[in-house]
């Protein structure tokens, strides 16, 4: 197991940054342009795996307004993407496909740390982007986005891809903030949630950004999500696994057996692609209709965690390895793209890309 600081590919990034200045200056001036240019130039490549899929890092220097995005209306994916593009890079068109999410997640407690393990599983291969954000009126965080969802698996290769990668904060799939709150999204088999109770609407990606920026505990995250109507993205349904520094781990989901799709919160140590609120009705190694699948992976995680007295990082990695998945083109939730152990007390993340278990990248919020 190795820990790497990464190689920024300085020469190539420098050339792209120079080219980017003209593009930004065409639509912005002053502080607006400077913050976009700084963000563009922060992109660096951290890994050097063979092939098209690697780990990148970007630090967000521009300001964004989540409330303005929400107020613009996120009734569908395109409306959300348009609102985000106006915030991130006004005046430059960026075509982005809505993301999809799979996975496994669990909480483990050790004497000096509270850990959240996370496998991001999806059939389409992807590079990963570590996104650093520190909004003016919010909490600093690190999160991970799938660059394939942004059409930018090799962002250093073109200005178009580099610009698309700037949307990373609004396509994050998991992350942790400076208060020790971590969150991961997992896909489900039910029809997409579309709540319509009269509250302001958010979607799947906005939920993650809101929690990372504004929640100091799991309870605050639950209260925050409960103040909005949920609109699921990309034609699929999802739930959220949330943990904090106290070890308060819960699954937030939207009841598929109630037409109004009310938010339901369930305490759980581990979860995959089935409803925690209907866990007793879900069988392993099979599809369970709208209630989901993948319980065998949760049981494998539980077996590892229950088999030890101290749930260390080594134990967390063992649980992630035993629940990781090889590629299967017929299964959207196969093919583990990355695995992470978040430490909610020390606010760190240890990251492995595409089951390369011997190469671990470590980050601090």
Model-inferred region functions:
Residues 3-4, 13-16, 20-216, 230, ...:
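N-terminal mature-domain region immediately after signal-peptide cleavage
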Residues 7-8:
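Intrinsically disordered, low-complexity coil/linker segments enriched for acidic/polar
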């Amino acid at each position: 197991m190795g820990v790497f600081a990464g190689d920024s590919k300085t020469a190539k990034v420098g050339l792209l940054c120079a080219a980017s200045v003209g593009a930004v200056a065409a639509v912005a001036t002053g502080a607006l342009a400077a913050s976009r240019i700084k963000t563009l130039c922060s992109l660096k490549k951290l890994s050097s795996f063979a092939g098209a899929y690697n780990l990148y890092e970007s630090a967000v220097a521009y300001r964004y307004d989540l409330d303005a995005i929400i107020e613009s209306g996120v009734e569908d994916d395109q409306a959300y993407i348009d609102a985000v593009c106006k915030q991130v890079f006004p005046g430059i068109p960026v075509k982005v496909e809505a993301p999809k999410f799979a996975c496994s997640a669990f909480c483990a407690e050790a004497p000096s740390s509270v850990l959240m393990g996370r496998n991001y599983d999806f059939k389409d291969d992807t590079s990963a982007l570590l996104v650093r954000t520190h909004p003016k009126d919010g909490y600093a965080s690190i999160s991970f986005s799938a660059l394939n969802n942004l059409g930018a698996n090799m962002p250093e290769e073109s200005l178009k891809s580099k610009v698309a990668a700037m949307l990373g904060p609004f396509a994050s799939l998991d992350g942790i903030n400076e208060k020790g709150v971590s969150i991961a999204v997992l896909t489900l088999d039910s029809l997409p949630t579309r709540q319509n109770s009269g509250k302001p609407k958010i979607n799947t990606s906005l939920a993650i950004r809101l929690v990372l920026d504004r929640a100091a505990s799991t309870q605050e995250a639950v209260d925050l999500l409960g103040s909005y109507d949920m609109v699921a993205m990309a034609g699929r349904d999802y739930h959220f696994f949330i943990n904090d520094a106290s070890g308060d781990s819960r699954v937030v989901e939207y009841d598929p057996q109630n037409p109004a799709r009310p938010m339901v919160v369930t305490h759980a140590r581990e979860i995959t692609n089935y409803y925690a609120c209907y866990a007793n009705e879900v069988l392993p190694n099979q599809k369970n209709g709208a209630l989901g699948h993948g319980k065998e992976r949760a049981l494998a995680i539980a077996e590892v965690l229950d088999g030890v007295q101290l749930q260390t990082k080594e134990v967390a990695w063992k649980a992630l390895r035993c629940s990781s998945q090889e590629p299967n083109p017929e299964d959207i939730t196969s093919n583990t793209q990355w695995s992470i152990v978040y430490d909610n007390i020390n606010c760190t993340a240890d990251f492995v890309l595409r089951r390369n278990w011997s190469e671990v990248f470590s980050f601090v919020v």
